[in-house]
């Protein structure tokens, strides 16, 4: 049976993550409060951030920057700013 969470990002009850994907207290907070759908949205933004800003995940400062962006996106409702990205226009 799927585990549901009250997703703070989507502001609705939705299927939760199957297991804790991120370490520590923040990982527990994500597991308890973020849905699979919201996590998938974050992963798309994360990939774009890493590529556009040429982040190196071996660099502590880059990992800290990415973690702060994740907190802002998932818990504070702030959109990720990606320079030069223009969303596709739907017809």
Curated annotation (Swiss-Prot):
The keyword Cytoplasm does not apply. Signal peptide: none annotated. One of its GO terms (cellular component) is cytosol. GO terms for molecular function: iron ion binding. It comes from the Bacteria. Keywords: Iron. The keyword Zinc does not apply. One of its GO terms (biological process) is cellular response to oxidative stress. Pfam families: Iron_traffic (PF04362). InterPro entries: Fe_traffick_prot_YggX (IPR007457), Fe_traffick_prot_YggX_sf (IPR036766). Could be a mediator in iron transactions between iron acquisition and iron-requiring processes, such as synthesis and/or repair of Fe-S clusters in biosynthetic enzymes. Belongs to the Fe(2+)-trafficking protein family. This is Probable Fe(2+)-trafficking protein.
